[in-house]
Amino acid sequence: MALAVLSGDPMSSKPLVDKYREAAFKAGHPPENVKVAVTGHMFISKTNEQAIQEFYPYHSNYWSHVHSYHGIDEPLTKEDFERASGKETALFVGSSQQIIEKIMHQYELFGHQRFLAQIDIGGMPFKKAAENIERLAAEVAPVIRKETGKSSE
């Protein structure tokens, strides 16, 4: 199962993951074969405040595009974006430490085997996306692997 947790409280997705595992076990699948991946929008900067400032224009642009397909003509306000970037929310925006905490919080909820970061959204320049990938690889991934007992393979 690949679970896109893009907004709101990640806890709201837990019943879906629980049902998926329950159905798989009832169908006879061994627990080690019942995999869960979590995916979400991510932006890492030196501080939480800097990440919010830098990522807001791209995330707002992304949602404006998505909303246009559904006939919604409401822009994402900075205040809404700041709330969506809070500690207990799904959006992975902040310092490396905050990203680690959010991934680990969701790991405790879902017990997922894989996390997929959606970085290049909303017209973000390549240089910004590359910087985020580098921070993810150097500052976040090693800690997550250590905390979850996973190897880099």
Model-derived regions, located:
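Active-site-adjacent structural elements that line small-molecule/cofactor binding pockets in enzymes
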Residues: 1-153
